[in-house]
Amino acid sequence: MNYIQKYEKKQIKKTIPIFKSGDTIIIKVWIVEGTKKRIQLFEGIVIAIRNRGFNSSFCVRKVSNGEGIERVFPKYSPIIEEIIVKRHGDVKKSKLYYLRNRIGKSAKIRELISKKTS
């Protein structure tokens, strides 16, 4: 293994919960303002996941004050403090770009309800 692969392997050890497209997640992100550092929450729906090993990333969309905001996060970025899965969505596609054109109730995603076996 070369040095780059060793470095990537060390970075991948960061624990990240399992989530998929359609899930609502909360991301705690480090923000630097001047000399101060603080954590800011970004809550939204995962609309795309790009799996490329160490270079994996995911796109999260939220609507704030009627304006849609999309942000792409590298999965193993040091600015991500924590990822919390709030709810699992029931979707049939892996890329949910069609949500960009929808407003209000039509942009909602059904919640995935797991069946209990007895």
From Swiss-Prot:
Pfam families: Ribosomal_L19. InterPro entries: Ribosomal_bL19, Ribosomal_bL19_CS, Ribosomal_bL19_sf, Translation_prot_SH3-like_sf. Keywords: Ribonucleoprotein, Ribosomal protein. One of its GO terms (molecular function) is structural constituent of ribosome. PROSITE patterns: RIBOSOMAL_L19. GO terms for biological process: translation. One of its GO terms (cellular component) is cytosolic large ribosomal subunit. Belongs to the bacterial ribosomal protein bL19 family. This protein is located at the 30S-50S ribosomal subunit interface and may play a role in the structure and function of the aminoacyl-tRNA binding site. This is Large ribosomal subunit protein bL19. It comes from Buchnera aphidicola subsp. Baizongia pistaciae (strain Bp).
